[in-house]
A protein has these predicted regions:
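C-terminal structural segments of small proteins and small subunits
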Residues: 68-108
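Short secondary-structure boundary segments
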Residues: 8, 64-65, 85-86
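Amphipathic alpha-helical interaction surfaces in cytosolic regulatory modules
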Residues: 50-54, 60, 64-75
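N-terminal first-folded block
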Residues: 2-41
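Short connector loops at helix/strand junctions that flank enzyme active sites
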Residues: 18-20, 56, 76
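Compact, glycine-rich, soluble single-domain proteins
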Residues: 36-56, 60
Length: 108
């Protein structure tokens, strides 16, 4: 099982990780979405988002843009950051899972 979080504003990917208001959270088994939730963002203090996402066992974070400091915090928490996502969060996850998102950049 894999857990993916999308830094979001409502149901859409947030333009910048630091400005996200919530996370759309997806559980994936055998490349199939089996559960989704909308979770509030827990502030943007140094490392707080990484700790929160680690606690809910997220392994991949999809986002629009993200600072190098946030990438490093996520990577230290064992979370792979994938930037360059946009549009609807669910569609971004589906494209990521299908390998159809050429605009995405993986940071790990």
């Amino acid at each position: 099982m894999m857990r993916i979080a999308v830094a979001s504003e409502g149901l859409d990917v947030s333009n910048h990780f630091g400005c996200c208001t919530n996370f759309n959270y997806y559980k994936v088994i055998d490349n199939q979405l089996v559960d989704s939730r909308n979770l509030p963002s827990h502030g943007h203090l140094c490392g707080s988002q990484a700790n929160f996402l680690r606690q809910i066992e997220v392994r991949v974070l999809l986002c629009g843009t993200i600072s190098q400091n946030d990438i490093e915090s996520m990577n230290k928490a064992g979370i792979t950051v994938v930037s360059g996502a946009s549009g609807n969060a669910l569609q971004a996850v589906e494209e990521y899972l299908q390998g159809n998102a050429e605009q995405l950049v993986v940071h790990n």
